Swiss-Prot record:
Catalysed reaction, written as an equation: IMP + L-aspartate + GTP = N(6)-(1,2-dicarboxyethyl)-AMP + GDP + phosphate + 2 H(+)
Keywords: Cytoplasm, GTP-binding, Ligase, Magnesium, Metal-binding, Nucleotide-binding, Purine biosynthesis
Protein name in the entry: Adenylosuccinate synthetase
EC number: 6.3.4.4
Cofactor: binding details: Binds 1 Mg(2+) ion per subunit.
Length: 430
């Protein structure tokens, strides 16, 4: 039995929700280990649709332990709203079924205010933040001024910590010409939310160690994607945490050997939300068609996603930097009916062909894709549940992707429906 980490191998929005739901039905524990409530996904179980952004996917399934690890930045108000929403749909959420690491950093209302004020001040240089305070909260964590969940139970230190926070952030807001945060109002907001969120606080590393020793199946659920990783992504157009699977251990309080299989969720084409380099982006009718067929709009923000051809260079890089064992290829059915498909196999940069995405911002914006062209297929792949159901040209496309990214396709998804999945290997099996 192997514990599994699920991560995105592109810029997020790869279809992790369906795959994580499929895997979480077989896991005992589901752990979120990084990010905040800036990325979301939709689960459909029976006739009920659940939109989650902070809660682990296992929360909607009875008998599963859901864990929010120390690597997550938690907005208590957003978390409680999400809990209320799924409770209204019949899901039981209690401090016995949901644990939040007592040492996780909190997102407070001031973080959203700072996030939005700074993004507005950037003008044409916006980085595409959701404005929900995730970046500023991570900054406070690294700068050692964050208020953590455990602090809400300690009145002796809480007010001093709030003073320290406001000294820093109100200076920023003044400099940006934005309204300052009122201390009394912030303290009242914290006092109101504390008794509602503290029951979920737990010594998460200890509970996960107990689960490991009991040989429970643990699923680590990543948010966003490898190319949004703060170190390995298209910096500065990235998120504020490490999204690669290596962070599953640090972000949950477990050792580096805890993950036995890393599954990289990979869309059969490429999408991106917000600003930043996108070598294979299509701004023509083909790109528009991909977006319409794939329903490429954000779960949380509703923002339209940019669309383009599959970028094997980028995915291979994500596989290497993220330790991905195998990929789950999603949305193959979106490519049905295209007479011709293209896959990026290299970049042209300064007169040479390179096979990696450069780290420099100027170089990332300047690379031009080198394509390999494939014959498309007219038949439908939607709902296929075996290789025999796929057109030969679709099989050829998938096999060539495996060769180019240097990793096997472990799962193949052919529709949003949970059971429309072709399984080549069970990630939970050793």
């Amino acid at each position: 039995m192997a514990n599994v980490a699920v991560v995105g191998s592109q810029w997020g929005d790869e279809g992790k929700g369906k795959i994580v739901d499929w895997l979480s039905s077989r896991a005992d524990v589901v752990v979120r280990f990084q990010g905040g409530h800036n990325a979301g996904h939709t689960l459909v179980i029976g006739d009920v649709e659940y939109k989650l952004s902070l809660l682990p996917s296992g929360v909607v399934r009875p008998g599963k332990l859901s864990v929010i690890g120390n690597g997550v930045v938690v907005d208590p108000w957003a978390l409680l709203r999400e809990i209320d929403t799924i409770r209204a749909k019949g899901v039981t959420v209690t401090p016995e079924t949901l644990l939040v690491a007592e040492n996780c950093a909190l997102i407070l209302p001031l973080h959203g205010a700072v996030d939005r004020a700074r993004e507005e001040a950037r003008g044409a240089s916006k980085i595409g933040t959701t404005g929900r305070g995730i970046g500023p909260a991570y900054e406070d964590k690294v700068a050692r001024r964050a208020i953590r969940l455990c602090d809400l139970a300690d009145d002796r230190v809480l007010e001093d910590k709030v003073d320290h926070l406001l000294f820093h952030h109100n200076a920023l807001l003044r400099g940006l010409g934005a309204a300052e945060i009122d201390k009394a109002e912030l303290m009242a907001q914290i006092a109101e939310v504390a008794p509602r969120i503290l029951p979920y606080a737990a010594v998460v590393w200890q509970r996960l160690d107990e689960a490991k020793r009991a040989r429970k199946r643990i699923l680590f659920e990543g948010a966003q994607g490898a190319m949004l990783d703060v170190d390995h992504g298209t910096y500065p157009f990235v998120t504020s945490s490490n999204t690669v699977a290596g962070n599953a251990a640090a972000g949950s309080g477990m050792g580096p050997g805890v993950v036995g299989y890393v599954l990289g969720i990979t869309k059969a084409y490429t999408t991106r939300v917000g600003s930043g380099p996108f070598p294979t982006e299509l701004t023509d009718a083909t790109g528009e068609q991909l977006g319409l067929r794939g329903r490429e709009f954000g779960t949380v923000t509703g923002r339209k996603r940019r669309c383009g051809w599959f970028d094997a260079v980028m995915v291979r890089q994500a596989i290497k930097t993220g330790g991905i064992t195998g990929i789950a290829l999603t949305k193959l059915d979106v490519l049905d009916g295209f007479s011709e498909l293209k896959v990026c196999t290299g970049y042209r940069y300064q007169g040479e062909i390179i096979h990696h995405l450069p780290a420099g911002q100027t170089a990332q914006a300047a690379v031009e894709p080198v394509y390999e062209t494939f014959q498309g297929w007219s038949e439908s792949t939607r709902g296929a549940r075996s290789w025999a159901d796929l057109p030969a040209t679709a099989v050829k496309y998938v096999r060539r992707i495996e060769e180019l990214v240097e990793a096997p396709v472990t799962l193949l998804s052919t529709s949003p429906e949970r059971d429309d999945t072709i399984l080549m290997r069970d990630p939970f099996e050793d």
